[in-house]
């Protein structure tokens, strides 16, 4: 079966690709009737995870189709996060907005709890969180493995959106939701190698979380399988606002830096400018997440887009089904992502390596 794309949906409805993308990602600036029409068409055509995670009613809302039961007295879905500040600029915000909308339609309340340093150190719960009121917990930006293991012992359904890295193969006893961290990076590396580029580096702490780890592994695997050695000098694990320090310590710069997310890419671009280097003139740059900043910066940043609305529906499905069937085997689910090539990796014909 042919894979359904955003363009296919746009063609079927006679609207622009950008309009369809806004509807699928729950972006602002779109009439609700138009959004509902597009989402219904996406389900009808079998677009990506929509056919798996939900059916939509005439109102464009999530229909649990047997996955959930009416809320009990404990009807709160709690969200734990160790980094509220990052959530303000993170892909999780549009995902959580949609998630909250759908939960309210099903009769559940929704609250976000900050897990502070003291909680992490002492393995205690946030002061205002009452386990007796909670039906389930969703953890976002929760990368302390020991604390996460404690959360898994509370006797509640737990879903991790991303999570601590599994470098050593140690998984948590809970469901996990991730974005596809491999396909976009693999494709970009393949395309760059096809243009004769060989010096490719990576910036980001691959032990920060599972997503960073998978993006790093995707980069190394793509290089290795193509028979191109990875220059370890071009792999910078450290990330800080002063990226000019590790960059200036390099004997030479690579031709491309792949960054673990867009914010690292933004800091890297600023540091390169301080060193008198331009993107893409002197070096190409790629991020991950498709944060709003990636579209408005100059040059616009090549990145990997996360479909936040699909992640919201998938998270809802995973939590509701776990609440109904607590003894299901633990699941790790990936939602599709999309490589977005912009000016930061743009080569002119003259610049392409022969």
Walk through the language-model features, giving the residues of each.
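Alpha-helical recognition/docking segments in bacterial nutrient-uptake
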Residues: 1, 65-190, 246-252, 263
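N-terminal helix-turn-helix DNA-binding module of bacterial transcription factors
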Residues: 1-65
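Short, solvent-exposed amphipathic alpha-helices that sit
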Residues: 90-105, 184-187, 210-229, 267, ...
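Short beta-strand elements in bilobed, periplasmic/extracellular small-molecule ligand-binding domains
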Residues: 103-115, 220-243
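Hydrophobic alpha-helical segments within soluble ligand-binding/sensing domains
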Residues: 175-202, 240-246, 265, 306-324
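An alpha-beta-alpha
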Residues: 186-228, 331-345
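Short acidic capping loops at alpha-helix termini that bridge into adjacent secondary structure
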Residues: 198-199, 230-234, 278-284
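Flexible loop/turn connectors
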Residues: 244-354
